Amino acid sequence: MISFGTFLLMQSPSARSSKEIYARGVEMAQAAETLGFGNVWLAEHHFSTYGYLSRPAQLATYIAAKTTRIRVGTAVIVVPLHHPLVIAEEIATLDLLSGGRLDVGLGRGYQPYEFERFGLELESGRARWEESVDILLKAFEGRPFTYDGKLFKIPETTIFPQPLQQPRPPIWITAQSPESVEAAVRRGFNVLTGGFGVPIERMAEFRRLFDRLVGEFKPPHPLRVGVQRAVYVAEDHADARAAAEEARWNMRVTLSLRNQYERVERGRAIPVPAPKEPDTDDLLDRFLVIGTPDTVIRQIKRIEEMVGITHFNCSFWFGDMEHARVMRSMERFAREVAPAFR
């Protein structure tokens, strides 16, 4: 059975106020709990209107205090941008304050634009990632440890507090490349793939690689696979096509920031057209989950068949879509789509 979550990037092409963007995010998280979603996942981005959410653990703590059941998750903490001991302390604190409702999403990051402004190089991210994850796992063992790496030298240290979930909260890795899939399976972490700009056939390739690597590494417990997609439950075909064009903003900015042809003007992310950009029909077929309720059900079942998922993460808020329209789509999904998967 598929579990459903919702994802908050908290972008604003029109550069709305931070107060408005955060109020929208909190309202969506509370609505997600009321509507029966199992998770709310929070991104981490910096220095542009592509994402106002720079401290996902802080917002997750606030959301946890405003809810009682829904699990909160980071999707993701960009590990190389932080000291691993600080990450460990934040994760443990959030897990305690949420009553053990935390899922931890970790990632290497993909935007040179962000890394440069922290005085880092994206190319160094892989080495920082590997050592940081080593340290995180040691920190969650609850006993003194040392670490002697190339990048981090840690004398005997014990982390306080320790997380409520033992031996640690579930860890998910965002995987947009074969290397990330391998890193997740090798460590015994769950995999979350998809996102803007990743076609369905690419996700199916990742699943085949995942299955092969599970056979090679033989993790000690079953691993979960999830997919994240822009989702909109439309009134009709014209409404669906209009929503797809809103999602195009996210795809353009994502790809431009990933591939270093971005335009950011006074913090405002500009949607630069991508080379060989898919047309609207192609977006709807291969990149998005947008359409009438029956269409959305068919699209998710297609992903389930091709990718073999146990978790589906809905990005309901994308582009500059009006808040009321986002909330209507979210409510229709809970009422008319989710029951088909129970």
Which positions does each model-derived feature cover?
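Short, acidic/polar
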Residues: K19-A31, E90, A175-E182, T295-I303
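N-terminal beta1-alpha1-beta2 module of alpha/beta enzyme domains
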Residues: M1-V72, Q166-P169
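Glycine-enriched alpha-helix->loop->beta-strand junction motifs that scaffold or abut catalytic
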Residues: K66-R69, S98, V185-L192, G308
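Hydrophobic faces of well-ordered beta-strands that scaffold small-molecule active sites
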Residues: F4-T6, V40-L42, V72-T74, L102-L106, ...
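Conserved, mostly hydrophobic/aromatic
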Residues: F4, A32, G36, E44, ...
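Active-site mouth loops of central-metabolism enzymes
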Residues: L8-Y22, I77-L85, Q165-A175, Y232-A234, ...
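Internal, glycine-rich beta/alpha segment that forms the wall or movable "lid"
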Residues: I2, H83-F189, I200-H221, E265
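An alpha-helical appendage that flanks or caps ligand/catalytic pockets
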Residues: S124-I159, E201-I309, A340-R342
